[in-house]
Amino acid sequence: MHLTADDKKHIKAIWPSVAAHGDKYGGEALHRMFMCAPKTKTYFPDFDFSEHSKHILAHGKKVSDALNEACNHLDNIAGCLSKLSDLHAYDLRVDPGNFPLLAHQILVVVAIHFPKQFDPATHKALDKFLVSVSNVLTSKYR
């Protein structure tokens, strides 16, 4: 999905605020995904799924760190996330349908914590960004 200059501007404007709370917001998005789509728990057999567990926060930080990298490479998301795509496709074999589920929850979390900044243009830009990330992470499945 092509990100326009305007999309990139909106992403770069809000993402540092999100990144500053990476483990918390990433964990919150994961927790929401696990609660709304329980089938996604199958990849985490030893997790404590309670909202603020060390497992949720640690994996939330991993998600946030990957999104930070993608945000820092908006012109080359595929190159920047290639190894992560390999990991999810070949080693972890994560259901590619899970990435849009998490992307949706990330949008929800950003909207909750940044209601003034989450205007329609920012919503559109972040949605396109997360779709781009999801597309990269599922590209090796084909």
Swiss-Prot record:
Transmembrane stretches in the record are: none
Q: Which GO terms describe its molecular function?
A: heme binding; metal ion binding; oxygen binding; oxygen carrier activity
Known tissue expression? Red blood cells.
Any one GO cellular component localisation term in the record: hemoglobin complex
Q: Which UniProt keywords apply?
A: Heme, Iron, Metal-binding, Oxygen transport, Transport
Q: Where is the Globin domain?
A: 2-142
Output this protein's name.
Hemoglobin subunit alpha
Query: What species was this sequence derived from?
Result: Xenopus tropicalis (Western clawed frog)
